[in-house]
């Protein structure tokens, strides 16, 4: 029992409405092996059956109005995900949830950045010195400059930001991400996004295979931006993260 408790991790997923947190929750469940098919909130038919949006109002409006918890085993840990309501009308449920989790995953829209409800929920997390991980979503749509988003997070929320990965392109040109931690390039699989897919993995920025998947202009831009990231932004500090003073950020698309 002690071993089970030690390996249990509970995350609240917070965001402004429509930033994509329920869709992201579905993908965690999919890649964690808890479900076989993800149900996108904005999709149609079978694909629209979101596991966390189970109330009639939630299904009709495509939003979460109550916190719902989902669990799955991952490696040697037991993961609890709590999908919280983003709309301010239902924020009391979210506030209660935040008091019972180990850390929070803050989802932001790449085109909109920090929005009002995100800021409110972040401040509740800050009152508890809760560690926060950030996911910048919807990179497959037109989005703001990546450095601009990071600057806004740092200035608006007064927290250091350190990228864990970096997007390759954006909008219709979004191809995948460069993993800064493991020095790998992950090229997105554009097949059926409701089922688990295997991305193309390239070893580092100098692997000649990269030219097969990434156009020269995008590769040059990526190299320039990675150099700026390493020169201008802080490295990950575990102590600062645990105290709620630094957030690692990942870029990508929950779809």
Which stretches of residues belong to each language-model region?
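P-loop NTPase switch module centered on the Walker A-proximal segment
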Residues: 1-108, 114, 163, 205, ...
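P-loop NTPase catalytic nucleotide-binding module
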Residues: 1-19, 109-255
């Amino acid at each position: 029992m002690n071993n089970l408790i030690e390996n249990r991790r509970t995350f609240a997923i917070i965001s402004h409405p429509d930033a994509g947190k329920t869709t992201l929750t579905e993908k965690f469940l999919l890649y964690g092996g808890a479900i076989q098919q993800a149900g996108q909130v904005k999709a149609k038919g079978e694909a629209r059956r979101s596991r966390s949006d189970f109330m009639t109002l939630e299904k009709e409006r495509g939003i979460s109005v109550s916190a719902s918890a989902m669990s799955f085993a991952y490696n040697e840990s037991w993961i609890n995900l709590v999908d919280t309501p983003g709309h301010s009308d239902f924020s009391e449920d979210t506030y209660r949830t935040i008091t019972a989790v180990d850390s929070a995953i803050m989802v932001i829209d790449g085109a909109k950045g920090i929005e009002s409800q995100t800021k409110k929920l972040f401040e509740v997390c800050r009152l508890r010195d809760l560690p926060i991980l950030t996911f910048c979503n919807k990179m497959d749509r037109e989005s703001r400059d990546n450095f601009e988003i990071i600057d806004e997070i740092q200035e608006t929320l007064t927290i250091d930001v350190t990228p864990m990965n970096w997007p390759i392109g954006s909008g219709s040109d979004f191809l995948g991400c460069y993993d800064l931690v493991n020095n790998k390039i992950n090229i997105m699989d554009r097949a059926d996004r409701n089922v688990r897919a295997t991305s193309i993995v390239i070893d580092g920025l100098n692997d000649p295979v990269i030219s097969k998947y990434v156009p020269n202009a995008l590769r040059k831009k990526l190299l320039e931006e990675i150099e700026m990231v390493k020169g201008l932004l802080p490295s990950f500090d575990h102590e600062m993260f645990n105290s709620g003073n630094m957030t690692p950020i990942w870029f990508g698309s929950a779809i």
